[in-house]
Regions:
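Peripheral, non-transmembrane regulatory/ligand-interaction domains of membrane transport proteins
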Residues: 1-142, 146-151, 156, 214, ...
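Hydrophobic alpha-helical transmembrane segments and their immediately adjacent juxtamembrane loops
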Residues: 145-244
Length: 244
């Protein structure tokens, strides 16, 4: 399994490898070049002694290299999660959420690969097979332990992604609450002003008698003072109530 980061997405490449093990032979089948197979082949060509311990030991060499290739992938994902965790607090965006879901999908794909491999290695390390030398079981046991640790790392990374997702949603909700709070305060401060300006701005009738006093200069200044002092008073009152 190989994972490559391409912008905001991750491309997961999974190549199927079939291995047939016999008493004195080992056959591998794969559609694309696999680094672990090529490295083992080159090692056997450089030093023929690598083939003298039996086909089962050669299987161990191949499997060990295959499992070792998971670590760079795990490190890539771990580094990506650290970067996203910083983005969650500094500049969360829909793109951040997309990255979290992509990483979660990649980790789920890795888990589906690790679990069957772990079971196979557990059988090779514990069960009796004619094609497996008992002295080589300890090597397969070592690979099984590596797969167990990789599975645990995978679970830890999935927990980190889930935690980052929860944190992202909390940050977005808090920001939304702050926006709604600000808009509510602005609306509350200007509501009395809207009422006063609307009431004194009505032109439905001509002022007569005592109502003529409403259009005098002193009334204008009184209303203007109320329009200025009322928002200030409401602001001070909200501050004392610790609403701001």
């Amino acid at each position: 399994m190989d994972v490559k980061e391409n912008g905001n997405t991750w491309e997961t490449e999974v190549d199927e490898l079939d291995i047939f093990l016999g008493q004195n032979y080992i056959v591998t089948h794969h559609d694309y070049p696999i680094t672990a197979i090529e490295e083992t082949w080159e090692a056997c060509n450089r030093d023929p002694r690598n083939t003298q311990n039996g086909a089962d030991h050669l299987l161990y060499k191949i499997t060990d290299r295959l499992v070792a290739e998971y670590m760079p992938t795990v490190e890539k994902i771990d580094a990506a999660i650290d970067q996203i965790e910083d983005q969650v607090f500094d500049r969360p965006s829909p793109r951040t959420l997309e990255k979290l879901f992509v990483l979660k999908r990649v980790l789920l794909a890795m888990r589906r690969i690790l679990l069957p491999q772990r079971e196979v290695l557990n059988k090779l390390a514990r069960d009796d097979y004619r094609v497996i030398d008992p002295k080589d079981r300890i090597f397969f046991r070592d690979i099984y332990d590596h797969l167990v640790r990789l599975h645990d790392l995978n679970e830890s990374l999935r927990d980190l992604v889930s935690g980052a997702l929860d944190t992202y949603l909390s940050v977005i909700n808090n920001r939304m609450n702050e926006v709604m709070k600000t808009l509510t305060i602005i609306t509350t401060l200007f509501m009395p002003l809207t009422f006063l300006t609307g009431f004194f701005g009505m032109n439905f009738f001509e002022p007569l008698g005592l109502m003529k006093a409403w259009t005098t200069t002193p009334v204008f200044y009184v209303v203007l003072a109320i329009n200025i002092l009322m928002p200030i008073g409401m602001y001070i009152w909200m501050r004392r109530r610790m609403w701001l």
